Regions:
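Rieske [2Fe-2S] iron-sulfur-binding domain
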Residues: 1-60, 66-74
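C-terminal catalytic domain of Rieske-type non-heme iron oxygenases
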Residues: 46-48, 53-339
Length: 339
């Protein structure tokens, strides 16, 4: 069955979906007694999933995904992200609104002339928010930012409440059902080490996967995800299509602003001669957490020695100037206070 065979494009060796080598064209024209197909199957790769992301790992010594995520899966369990989908939205011809009949894509890629770590660090901090992202700052206001990180290989922040303010177009998108008060009123912004950037809103998610190409080049693979409901119907309502298009353009505008500032920073770093500046504790502590993860993985002799970082302690001990969240996620609301 050719349809169930994985073919190498070079010499056309064929593999079954279980990884076994099933054909090696012309290889036996000169027989070899030391050749056993059973020895030459595809290399097994660890694959696990969480939410909308598939994770592949080439190092068997790396901790399992559940340990890597720490409490992140529990933190975001209320969203039911495993059911959210990236789709192409097309307005119904029966909406009576021809202007909404265009198709919008929910995936896109960007070529960034900057190191992947710089892109991730930029996402992890909000010190630049008011100056680089004037429109985003109307929805995700600096004064409403709080830390959002427990044990796990991630760093994060939340905007609570996330506000329509002067940009309420996205509110037309139907929210996920069953959200608690904290999830329903917040925006979560998580850097899952090393290369997954998540912007999680009550009614949509913007996912960015960073592909490190060279020391000065990164490809961003982006997708918009939607919860089950009108946005994922085969023919969604015209109002939803319009809201998605406005939301898509908004996030691409924000991402373009990030790309510009990261590329400018990359040019400065590449020239050398300027020492790095201090981190602003309130706004950039997640960057310090990210730096420690990079340093750990650069200096460990083996992944078996990796220690997944703990989270912020409850109370104010680790807040570095950030106030307590008025509507904390359930994993923080249920934690005991400490000083």
């Amino acid at each position: 069955d050719i349809g169930s065979t994985i073919r190498c494009p070079y010499h056309r060796w064929g593999y079954g979906t279980d990884g076994r080598l099933v054909s090696a064209p012309l290889f036996d024209s000169v027989p070899r007694e030391d050749f056993d197909r059973g020895d030459w199957g595809l290399v097994p790769v660890r694959v696990e999933t969480w939410g909308p992301v598939v994770f592949a790992c080439l190092d068997e010594r790396t901790p399992p995904l559940g340990e890597w995520l720490g409490d992140l899966a529990d933190r975001m369990s209320g969203y039911g992200l495993e059911e959210w989908r990236p789709i192409a939205l097309t307005a119904s011809p029966h909406d009576g609104d021809a202007s909404a009949a265009a198709t919008s894509t929910s995936t896109c890629t960007f070529d960034v002339a900057a190191n992947w770590k710089l892109v991730a660090e930029n996402f992890a901090e909000y010190y630049h928010l008011g100056w680089v992202h004037p429109q985003l700052a109307k929805v995700s206001r600096v004064k409403d930012h709080y830390r959002y990180q427990g044990p796990g290989m991630y760093c994060g922040q939340t905007t609570t409440p996330v506000s329509g303010d002067q940009r309420d177009d996205w509110l037309t998108l139907p929210p996920a059902s069953g959200l608690d008060h904290s999830d329903a009123t917040s925006g979560r912004f998580v850097t899952l080490f090393p290369n997954v950037l998540l912007s999680v809103l009550p009614n949509h998610v913007f996912v960015v996967l960073l592909e490190a190409v060279t020391a000065g080049r990164t490809i961003e693979h982006c997708a918009f995800l939607f919860p089950p409901g009108p946005a994922t119907d085969p023919v969604p309502p015209a109002a939803v299509v319009r809201a998605f298009e406005v939301t898509r353009r908004f996030w691409i505008e924000v991402n373009d602003e990030d790309i510009d500032i990261c590329e400018r920073a990359q040019r400065g770093l590449s020239r050398g001669g300027v020492p790095p500046g201090p981190l602003a504790p309130r706004f950039e502590e997640p960057v310090n957490r990210f730096h420690k993860m990079v340093a750990d993985l650069m200096t460990l002799e083996s992944m078996t020695d990796l220690s997944v970082p703990p989270g912020d302690r409850p109370g104010t001990a680790d807040r570095y100037g950030t106030a307590l969240n008025p509507a904390p996620p359930h994993v923080e609301a249920s934690a005991p206070e400490s000083g």
